């Protein structure tokens, strides 16, 4: 069984914001794999299905970004999901819009959703797909930037990165994450 988590904030006011690109990737996977995100439990919304013979759970924590671990850990405990069968997708300011970086482990890098996940799992050793949102320009505050929407010029690159993140998740169901990293980080 595999768990794929997208980080974001709940509520219509946060839909399609930079900080919610992880949620957008989960929506793409749900559509692609015909998985309904209709279960509400563990402080999140999730759905399960079978993809290429593998049971997959897709989760969007509804705790707000900074408390994401409060949703992830109880679901992992309930379904007895090992950390190596878990991947998290989230926004990253240090990567250009439209680009991905896959990592096997690492620090939170200033991302509070990842910090919460590390805190609740008790380890930094989990797989992640970092989705580029770039840094704010013209002196804009980071908080205003990440809670802002993508520009119309960015949308094609954003859609491309969501597709690539979904492709990476699909390949991960049948291949080691390290192999997927070599493909998608090049």
Swiss-Prot record:
Binding site for tRNA: 14, 64, 66, 112
Subunit structure, interactors included: Monomer.
Pfam families given in the database record: Pept_tRNA_hydro
Domain of life where this protein originates: Bacteria
Site feature: Stabilizes the basic form of H active site to accept a proton: 91
Keywords noted in UniProt: Cytoplasm, Hydrolase, RNA-binding, tRNA-binding
PANTHER family: PEPTIDYL-TRNA HYDROLASE
Family as reported in the entry's similarity comment: Belongs to the PTH family.
Name of the protein this chain belongs to: Peptidyl-tRNA hydrolase
Active site, UniProt feature: 19
Enzyme class: hydrolase
């Amino acid at each position: 069984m595999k768990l794929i988590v997208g980080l974001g904030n709940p509520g219509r006011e946060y839909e399609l914001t930079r900080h919610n690109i992880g949620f957008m990737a989960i929506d793409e996977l749900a559509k692609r794999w015909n998985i309904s995100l209709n279960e509400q439990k563990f402080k999140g919304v999730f759905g399960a299905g079978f993809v290429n013979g593998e049971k997959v759970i897709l989760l969007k924590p509804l705790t707000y970004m900074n408390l994401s671990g409060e949703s992830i850990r109880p679901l992992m405990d309930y379904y007895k999901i090992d950390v190596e069968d878990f991947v998290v997708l989230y926004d990253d300011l240090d990567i250009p819009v439209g680009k991905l970086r896959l990592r096997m482990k690492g620090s939170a890098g200033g991302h509070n959703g990842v910090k919460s996940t590390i805190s609740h799992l008790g380890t930094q050793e989990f797989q992640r797909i970092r989705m580029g949102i770039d840094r704010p320009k013209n002196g804009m505050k980071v908080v205003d930037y990440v809670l802002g929407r993508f520009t119309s010029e960015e949308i094609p690159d954003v859609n491309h990165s969501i597709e690539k993140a979904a492709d990476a998740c699909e390949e991960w169901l049948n291949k080691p994450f390290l192999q997927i990293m070599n493909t998608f980080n090049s």
